């Protein structure tokens, strides 16, 4: 029996018949690629997951075996919720018009990168390379020293190109 006064988000949705899926963004710990916080590359990666859940994209069990896996357990209707990074990505995904994305419930997030970094047209951040610094901040791959050692130079070159 659930105490509805003390549910976490997952339990809230699970007891109502929803499946809960978590996926890491590009460059976050345990994933591939480089963190590019808020860019079209990052939004497209999450869009691919929604397309898979909707039945419009093929996914594979791993990078080498070429064994396809379907989300046959999914109704194809995808909702999103979250705060901060997880809230921000929802706004970006909603602008793509991806089929299957139904409600978004961003508890907190950046809806406008321009407004987030500017006030009345003037930058509110003294850091010249703010987007690069934000990318470094959101990048979780540096938490795994063995993994980060394999990408450090390329990631640095990518961020400051």
Model-based region annotation:
Residues 1, 20, 52:
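Serine-hydrolase catalytic-loop signature spanning alpha/beta hydrolases and amidase-signature enzymes
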Residues 1-6, 28-43:
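Accessory recognition modules or surfaces
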Residues 3-7, 15, 43, 61-63, ...:
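Accessory cap/linker subdomain of secreted extracellular hydrolases
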Residues 12-16, 71-74, 97-98:
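Extracellular/periplasmic catalytic domains that process cell-envelope and extracellular macromolecules
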Residues 14-30:
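Conserved alpha/beta-hydrolase
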Residues 20, 78-82, 86, 90-94:
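Conserved catalytic-core segments centered on acid/base and nucleophilic motifs
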Residues 28-31, 86-89, 111-116:
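Flexible loop/turn segments at secondary-structure boundaries
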Residues 36-41, 48-84:
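Gly/Ser-rich "nucleophile elbow"/oxyanion-hole loop immediately N-terminal to the catalytic nucleophile
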């Amino acid at each position: 029996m659930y105490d509805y006064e003390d549910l976490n988000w997952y339990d809230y949705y699970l007891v109502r018949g929803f499946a809960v899926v978590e996926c890491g963004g590009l460059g976050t710990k345990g994933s591939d690629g480089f963190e590019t916080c808020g860019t079209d590359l990052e939004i497209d990666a999450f869009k691919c997951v929604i397309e898979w859940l909707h039945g419009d994209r093929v996914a594979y069990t791993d990078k080498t075996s070429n064994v396809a896996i379907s989300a046959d357990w999914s109704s194809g209707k995808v909702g999103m919720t979250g705060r901060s990074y997880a809230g921000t990505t929802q706004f970006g995904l909603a602008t793509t018009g991806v089929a299957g994305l139904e409600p978004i419930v961003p508890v907190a997030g950046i809806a406008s990168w321009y407004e987030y970094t500017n006030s009345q047209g003037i930058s509110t951040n003294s850091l010249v390379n703010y987007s690069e610094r934000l990318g470094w901040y959101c990048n979780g791959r540096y938490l795994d020293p063995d993994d980060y050692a394999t990408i450090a130079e390329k990631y640095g070159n990518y961020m400051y190109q």
